[in-house]
Amino acid sequence: LECKEKIPDAAKRTIEHFGIDAGFKFIVHETYPPHSGFGSGTQIAVSTAHLITETMGIEIESRELSTIVGRGGTSGIGTYTHDLGGFILDGGHSKEEKPLFLPSGASKAKPATLIARYEFPEDWNILIAIPEIEVHVEGDDEVDVFQTYCPIPKEEVEQVSHLILMNLVPFMLEKDIKNFGWAVSELQKVGFNKLEHSLDPHYLPTMQALDDAGAYGTGISSFGPTLYTVFDDDNKDIVKAAEEIVGKDKVKVTKAQNHGYVIEK
């Protein structure tokens, strides 16, 4: 359903922006759950625009395409991972660029500026769990959250920045998986993540159960419901535990992708 909505919308925006006099047919072979914290909306929209511009021989950066199709107004993560893959850190927006706190789909701002991009350890296993949650925060509800609870207190923003720059990133570069997981857990206790958990505490028991089962640290992606953790051979039993907690069909083990989009001709 998300593809049926977002592909025509992104195609229409792209065609109108460039004045293209042509029609396009899109065939989607596989996708992943919408509104689940995967950033699928941005990937679908930017990929649609990219296929059109590539076909028409138009050279343009994905950051510009994101703006054209109305994505990336909150975070640049989806745009930069589309191009580069890996671990992305962006710097937010200036008040001139984005005077109001709004989610990506409701903001006309360009994707935030890229601060850093690193290779994510490809030997680390990534566990993704999608618990059954009836309520997804999206659309007008998401806008209401941003307008009601933002800005996040400066002290908490400073805490988040310290955890990322002085803990999460260094531990990742040092391939210290256990302390990287610890940093992920600490990030759940401050800033926007803390707000998310206070507004919807349904995820907390599942996250605690995963941690109790041996996860090095469990995080929530965007507004959820997707939860994630990293693991190695020392705690690989976390996979079986996760399947027992949320259901075997709700768990996926994967690796990092340290490259961007691929166009096959």
Predicted feature locations:
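Generic structural signal for residues in well-ordered beta-strands
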Residues: 24-28, 218, 251
